[in-house]
Amino acid sequence: MALSIHDNQLISYEVHCEERTITLRTEYRVENKPTEFTNVVFEGVQAYHFENDAFGNIIFDAANVPVEQFLTEYGAEISELYRMNGSPTWAADLVSAPEYLREQGIKGFILSSSLGLSGWAVAKEISILPVNAPR
């Protein structure tokens, strides 16, 4: 059975620029049960945007969406990121971007929350990993 992050609390997140990874550290807390620790790791990150951090965020899902759908929904925002900082370079031409992203194995992911932090990432992979309890 695949790990779920639905209703997990976001404890922290880390953006590692040089490695191009983002790690979301989450916990699933239920009274009278052991806390489940799960990390969501985006690898090969090309671009991302998170917003609405409530410092008590509850994740709903992190979903992979088709590139065309992703660019239809977030293309204007990605174009603005490119205008401001020149990255990601493929955003200079959003018409040819879907083909480039597919060729490079890059996908769009949408992070949705029941409360707080939401946003998106453009990355090669997402992994949902169990973690031993922190010491």
Tell what function each PLM region has.
Residues M1-R135:
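Surface-exposed, interaction-prone regions used to assemble/regulate multi-protein complexes
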